Amino acid sequence: MAGNGNESTGGDFSFSAAAARDALPRITTEKGGKSPGPADVCQDDIAPRVNFQTIDELHSLQKKRSAPTTPLRDGSASGVSGTSGPTTPVSSETMLQSVSASLASLTRETGPKLIRGDPTSAAKVAHVPVTPTSLPAADVSDSGLKFTHILHNLSPAELYEQAIKFEKGSFVTSTGALATLSGAKTGRSPKDKRVVKDDTTEAELWWGKGSPNIEMDEKTFLVNRERAVDYLNSLDKVFVNDQYLNWDPENKIKVRIVSARAYHSLFMHNMCIRPTPEELENFGTPDFTIYNAGKFPCNRFTHYMTSSTSVDINLGRREMVILGTQYAGEMKKGLFGVMHYLMPKRKILSLHSGCNMGKDGDVALFFGLSGTGKTTLSTDHNRYLIGDDEHCWSEAGVSNIEGGCYAKCIDLARDKEPDIWNAIKFGTVLENVVFDEHTREVDYTDKSVTENTRAAYPIEYIPNSKIPCVGPHPKNVILLACDAFGVLPPISKLNLAQTMYHFISGYTALVAGTEEGVKEPRATFSACFGAAFIMLHPTKYAAMLAEKMQAQGATGWLVNTGWSGGSYGTGSRIKLAYTRKIIDAIHSGSLLNASYRKTDIFGLEIPNEVEGVPSEILEPINAWPDKMAYEDTLLKLAGLFKSNFETFTSHKIGDDGKLTEEILAAGPNF
């Protein structure tokens, strides 16, 4: 996109003369708009089970004991004044009827009686008109005779009150964020995720080896749906969020989330796109509905169930059911999977990537698995943030799917990631962090509850975020790999076939925990850098990406944010400052005109120099003191790449076989 802003992409923008943070001009927008094998699916946020036996033990991990900073009188803790319940605005009968239909029992074919507002509030509120008076039918349960209170699209302040008052383990931190606990599950449960397999999805979806899609039948889904709906209807109150996915106004999706916890409601308030009052008034019937009954287990003896946890997606009914896990990330990633199904039907590519834009309108995509630096590198003081995790690439350009960011917090430091640090304030959800019991200051280094601590905040909490979160077509596609083997160059320029090869491979390397006594790095491959969430075969997404990169003249890059001078344990991690210099050189275009030389085995083109980066690390073998060890390690990694890619060799990519042949030839060459 040209820097004069003449090109429109879902909401015009221009650059004002007033300087923003770090001399970056502000955007002015118009209102609108066990160790897994190589064939297994890589999961970004799986966490081991929390080491506790009771709920009280879990809560005891959350708060660190310390001497109080202010003496307490009479040896008692200072009290907190009570807060009033949430306000109850005038009810929309249409909204209540719509929610009642969402919560209808499939057996009784009637929705619950709904009241808008907090059941603890004394205020009189309107309710859904009851159907004509008749004698109770034989299949009416006690829950069908009561009213269920609906807390619809509450504000963050109201959700804070609900969480602190009714959800044990909810606290306000020293910076104003809401600290919560997700219970026994502190990460996603991919082995408990199910997708309904019917005549349509059997033909369309990716099934079998390497696929994240584990089948279930329609009947079992309906059993779990009924269990979830009955549980939600048995509660005195439920939280309902009506929100959107995708900032592209022509392709946004209406989603409804029905949940039992204020924590879940606030999480989705932050992560989805928040509607205006006018949009909410005319919201109507959602395109997709989530029933989050995570506090209630599924029946593990039900067909296709393997535990008390089940996360079920029915693409035909456009519904998702969550039972037996309170980890909020299941909702976020469940919807991402749905977008991976819906968007390609509209010829729109859904991407697990970060995205930012320079002041001249140049857009970059960042692909990478957990720990590669995707969020860190896409959040750049000198560029506008379009999004940190989920995007769409359409004929109009790129758009963020979400309305918020979900950042890892482990070892978070103000000096290393100031934007994320400063975003943790009022309205932000902090999951499973440990804090001082008196000062409420969070210790981001403490892993007592889990290593997978997270912060969920609205994207506008990032100072340089671009609202609306849309941009022109990308100029650069950056593939990030944290190579713990230490043999990949810090920066490589890729041709189209190489870009597709590494995109389909989705490589990074993990280091086993010290408790296992293993220090060798482990290669991990996740197709399209997000195999845990994709619905179609990876080659379908690769074909779409190749087509769009060709049409827009985008350049592919492979950036190693891992080790240099040796593998993990002998080498050293490439400094973040060097990686930022490399990324800056990509953005500026200087690397396009650099001189390159080609590496052995992988055939990667590496620049002879990058300003601000030591030349000795650009060629990996030069940084290794033991050259023979380097050659052996390089061959080992190349073999792992080839073994992983065997799954895809029989699939055609694109309209003809030429691209497929080029991609196969772009892999390691022994």
Swiss-Prot record:
It comes from the Eukaryota. GO terms for biological process: gluconeogenesis. Coiled coil: none annotated. The keyword Endoplasmic reticulum does not apply. The keyword ATP-binding applies. It is found in: Cytoplasm. Its EC number is 4.1.1.49. GO terms for cellular component: cytoplasm. Keywords: ATP-binding, Calcium, Cytoplasm, Kinase, Lyase, Manganese, Metal-binding, Nucleotide-binding, Phosphoprotein, Pyruvate, Transferase. Ca(2+) binds at H269, N270, G403. Pathway: Carbohydrate biosynthesis; gluconeogenesis. The modification Phosphoserine is found at S66. The modification Phosphothreonine is found at T70. It holds the Pfam family PEPCK_ATP. Substrate binds at R188, Y327, K333, R454. Allosterically activated by calcium. It may represent the only case of a monomeric, allosteric enzyme. Binds 1 Mn(2+) ion per subunit. It catalyses: oxaloacetate + ATP = phosphoenolpyruvate + ADP + CO2. Mn(2+) binds at K333, H352, D389. Involved in the gluconeogenesis. Catalyzes the conversion of oxaloacetate (OAA) to phosphoenolpyruvate (PEP) through direct phosphoryl transfer between the nucleoside triphosphate and OAA. Belongs to the phosphoenolpyruvate carboxykinase (ATP) family. Monomer. HAMAP family: PEPCK_ATP. This is Phosphoenolpyruvate carboxykinase (ATP) 2. It comes from Arabidopsis thaliana (Mouse-ear cress).
